[in-house]
Curated annotation (Swiss-Prot):
Protein name: Small ribosomal subunit protein uS3
Domain KH type-2: 39-107
Keywords: Ribonucleoprotein, Ribosomal protein, RNA-binding, rRNA-binding
Gene Ontology annotations for the cellular component aspect, listed alphabetically: cytosolic small ribosomal subunit
Protein purpose: Binds the lower part of the 30S subunit head. Binds mRNA in the 70S ribosome, positioning it for translation.
Assembly mode: Part of the 30S ribosomal subunit. Forms a tight complex with proteins S10 and S14.
Region of interest (Disordered), ranges: 210-230
Signal peptide: none
Family under the similarity heading: Belongs to the universal ribosomal protein uS3 family.
GO terms, biological process: translation
PROSITE patterns cross-referenced by the UniProt entry: KH_TYPE_2, RIBOSOMAL_S3
Organism from which the protein derives: Neisseria gonorrhoeae (strain ATCC 700825 / FA 1090)
InterPro entries: KH_dom, KH_dom-like_a/b, KH_dom_type_2, KH_sf_prok-type, Ribosomal_S3_C_sf, Ribosomal_uS3_bac-typ, Ribosomal_uS3_C, Ribosomal_uS3_CS
Amino acid sequence: MGQKINPTGFRLAVTKDWASKWFAKSTDFSTVLKQDIDVRNYLRQKLANASVGRVIIERPAKSARITIHSARPGVVIGKKGEDIEVLKRDLQVLMGVPIHVNIEEIRRPELDAQIIADGIAQQLEKRVQFRRAMKRAMQNAMRSGAKGIKIMTSGRLNGADIARSEWYREGRVPLHTLRANVDYATSEAHTTYGVLGLKVWVYTEGNIKSSKPEHESKQRKAGRRNAAAN
């Protein structure tokens, strides 16, 4: 199951948290969800060069709080904060409620799956060979401390007539282990030959320890050994 399912959804409430944190009545749910999708699409286009890794949307009492995780916060804020004010106005029009925007810096962008995927997509759009772009991103991630990384690209690679998929992996990426901290992201590269799809898995340190007491697990192991001996 871990091979097919979205790794982020698979690990929600274990090592991952929700990107949208709000509650809505069943009659309003579709409207609020559509607003979230519009906001994310707008930010993806507006901040294409700001290396945005994650956008968190919260909706406390008749307002909204948006947290943008970016490797280049200066690009998001702009000179003297001009760009962030324009951003707030546009988001307020989209959501129809007062907006508060927080900017958080990503310290190690080489380990952020979304930034890696978007970076490779931009290189593919500039006609960089896909193997070179993928291997360079993998080397940077492993050099920065990743325990494993896997990158897959699909489509008309190098302008081939028949679409195919190629993937490369370095280190280990345990997709079945729920406590493993696996960051997953997708992106698209729009080239003259069509759209190329990208998927990135990054495995970093930060496994969650078992909540069971250590002495309890030892007692159970001892009990199993005694049962096997009898």
